C-alpha cells in the first residue's frame, strides 16, 4: 500500500495538528516512511514527544484525555492532571475506537538541543535536528538509527525482519553511529556482523 494513503498516518497528523512542540513517528511506521511504502501490518503507531513538553501534551490532548498505559503489561489507568511521566515505563494511549490503529505517545529524554537515549545512562545522544526526518508532506519521523537503537534490544522476530528489510537503506554515517551504540551497549548483539 502507498504510504501517502495511510489512514493511520492521516489520523496522527490530525491528532497532532494543534500540538506546538516537536514530535516524531517512531517504530515500524517510521521505517515505512523512510522506505516510502507500507512494508508490513502494524498493530499500533508510536508517536514520540519530549518528556520536557509533558505540560504541553496535557494542554493539547484534552478531549478525550489519554490514559497512562504500561507498555509491558498493557494495564491502563487515568492520567492525573499534573502527573509527570518519565521516558520508558509509560505511554499515553487514546481510546482504540477513535483511530484506525491505536496511537500511543511515548516520551523521549532530552538535554537542551539533544535527544538522549534513556536506556544509555545519558551517554548516547544526538542533536534533535539530526534525528528528525520528514516525509514528502512534512510528517516528522525518527531517523533509522534511532528506531533501530530501540528495536535492537527487543529481540522480537518482527524487529529482526524490519532490520533485514531496510538495512541496505542506511547511509554510512548513520550506520556507523548505530554500530558504535550497539557495540557499546550490547557487544554480543546479533546485528553487529551485518555492519562489519
Features from the language model and the residues they span:
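Compositionally biased terminal segments of proteins
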Residues: 1-196
